[in-house]
UniProtKB/Swiss-Prot annotation:
Principal location class: endoplasmic reticulum
Lineage start: Eukaryota, Sar, Alveolata, Apicomplexa, Aconoidasida
Coiled coil: 554-626
Protein name per Swiss-Prot or TrEMBL: Protein SEY1 homolog
Gene Ontology MF term list: GTP binding; GTPase activity
UniProt-annotated binding residues for GTP: G56, S57, Q58, S59, S60, G61, K62, S63
Amino acid sequence: MESSNHLPNKDSDTVSVTPVEFSNYQCEINPGFNDFLKKSGFEDFGFKFNVVTILGSQSSGKSHLLNSLFNASFQTMDASKGHSQTTKGIWGSLVLSKDTSMNATVVFDSEGTDSRERGEGRLTFEHRSSLFCLALSDVVIVNIWYNSMGNLTGSNYGLLKTVVEANLELVDTNNEENYKTVLFFCVRDWSPSLSPLNVVKDYVLNNYMSSIWNEISKPARFENLGVESLFEIRVFGLSNAVTQSESFEMDVKEVKKTWNSLKPREYSRRVPSDGFFVYSKNVWKTIIEQNHLDIPTQKEMLSSYRCSEIKTMILESLTNALPELKEKDFSEYLMGLLKKVENQYFSQASRYDPVVSKKVGKELLEQVCRKFQPFFESALGDYVKKLAVESSSLLDKEFSVNSSGKELKVSNARPYTVWPNFSKKCEELQKKQTEKLSHHLSSFKVTFKSTVSFEFEFEYQPLKDHLNLLVSSEFEVLRSRHLELLKQQLDSMCNSCFALVKNNMMDRSLNEDQFWDYFDELFDETHKNCVDQLTTSYVGLVKGATRTEFEQLSLVLLLKATQSNFEELQNNLEQLLLERFDKFFNYQEFKGELIPTEWHKQSAQELNNRYKESKEDALTLLQVLKTTKTKKLPSFDANYVKKNQYFYSTLEGPVSDKYSSPLTEQFTIELTNSCSKKFMEMYKNAQVVQNAGTSVSSWRNIPPVFWLVLLVLGWNELRAAFRVLLKFYILIPLLIVSYFTFSYSANKLLGPKANEYVKPVRDKALSLLTALFAWFVRTLHMIASKSSSFKQQTKNLKMAKKGNKNRDSDDEYVGKTVTKSSHSIYKHREPMDINLIVDHDEVEAEKNNLPCWRAAYASGPARPQRHLCVICGFFANYKCRNCATRRIEAINSYYCSLRCLEVHNETNCGKAVHLAQW
């Protein structure tokens, strides 16, 4: 039921929520009141709220006063319809401050006392409502009329007596001297002209409260105390709300100001906002069922309250004082802190009930230990990480990968024999590390024995969960690595399949139906091999996986790899077409093998026909790839697959059910035109070879005998050319240039590694130059000795010449004979030793009874076995036949080469040149 007359306060800084019934006329609690509090957000206030209740006679303006004080909207009486009962039961409203940092206020408007409608049962309800208001409220407003002061019933004298008696059950002044129930006496229709406010206050305090305090029976401890020890009493005079509305508003502001100054910062009953409804309901039920408040003794409540306050204060002081600790310092620091906290707590709590204080003290120490739970986990975090890294290293060592060779090795064995044990090994390592952690954590159990004795074990499960998470993460990294290797094995199978496909594409009998049927069978066979070979490995790597799952998964992955291979093949399709054309056009079968085509043996017509057929056969591949086939894909539960399976994360986007993307018509035309041009180039090259073979005899047709004759006839020229190249002034520069060329090329090609190859060559060259230099020195020495020998021989010849002047005529005859012989020798270019020449001269001399020129050597030293060139000093290979006929000059007629011999001819013999090898 909502209020019909709402009197808002224009200066109010609060917002009131529409009142809701708490208890109806029959004293039944309304469950909707709890929903009302929840919807209003009251549960979020904690202890930051206050409770205000009001007591007073029926039709005394209680609801109007609450509306004026808190800007509430309780229903008020419509005087135009006569006096009657307006508020029935107990209603509650929630007043929220516009400043969110301020407390909320729960306002209860209760049914008025002295109700004619209640009849004889009015006293029961008055007693119940009074106890309820006193048990819940931070402040109780007593609303009385000025004109009723002095009356027994109208002034609520009996109600006040009930309030005072009930409060004795709730307060123990011995333990909490400052605790007082606040009573606001609001005297309505008061005016200074009627009576001063001080007189009214004295009347309320003395004639009402003190009189009641003296009349009731009190425990012994309250005998010497006044009513002021239990209550904080304030008396306010309120002007008439109708005739003196402005004065009434000012008086209400004074009441509100006093309330704001006296209200506690937190709810005095220490009941949180989310449990307020349950607390209120239990209090109301207790009052109805037992007619008195069945609450624990105030001493225990006070001890519990104060010890809890001390405990809270100490815990709050520890919040910002806890440091980050290392594992080795944790236990020592914690035990020292517990001793310090215990001493600090009992220095204040020892004045209260020992049972309660020890109980709360134990709770305090336990809560201190619980506050250390995050620091405990942080201190042991490094140890947990160490265990995780250790487990990862052990697993990595157990499944070490070696891919350096041609075949993948895991733990120096074939992966298919090792992978099936992966998940089992992971579980064993994880269990081992968890047991190791549990054993280590048992050393951190807290055993405290002092004023309070207790044992405490930290919550180990978060650390175990953290270890399992880290270990699982490390294992997942290794698992993903091995699954990637497994996927590479699967891709390798697919690539091997495509090697066969490419061979099939080079077949001349290729056609569309045959190719796709062949590929379909090959794909199924590859998939079967993959499942047979890799299923146990996959099941071992992925815990809980099944064979059916891998069959479906491998099919999708193979199809993805197939599409990738076909895409790569289409990118290189032009090269493949050229290879097909080259195979069909430039090669032919011979005894089951391909051999190059001999175009010079082919006719022009055969060449044209072969070109046409090869082109058509090569372009058949385009027609094959313009179509494709589909493969039925398996269906999966995406929610299950994505969070559990590794391979599906590698599939970027959806997978098509087609083996490949068919070639478009435009692409086919462009590719055909491009290939046709290159086909034509091959055709023209074949034409050139064919024309060259038919018009001119090939040098390959020259008989081998011709090459043999050519070698014999040109032997002297070949030897002369090689001798020129091997001379020092040509050979040495060539060697130097070759060495530097080799060094430069090696540095360019090999970089830093070039020294490995250049150094041996350099060492070999240096040793060769050293040997060459030694030979050169020896040669110079030999030349010097030959020179001295030559001088002696010349001297002997001159002496012989003087004694043989009569032989000049014989020399002419011998010269003619030798000249004739030399012409014959030169003509046939036959090698001849000088000894043969000398023997020939002796024979001719004997035939003609002439003296031989060798007789000149009879008295001199023996001829040396080797002769030196008289021009350059090198070993002689030639001699002049023209000079050989003159015996005295024969010793000077040796020459090393044709060039030196020509120099001799120009100077000595003129144009008559007769050569012979020595």
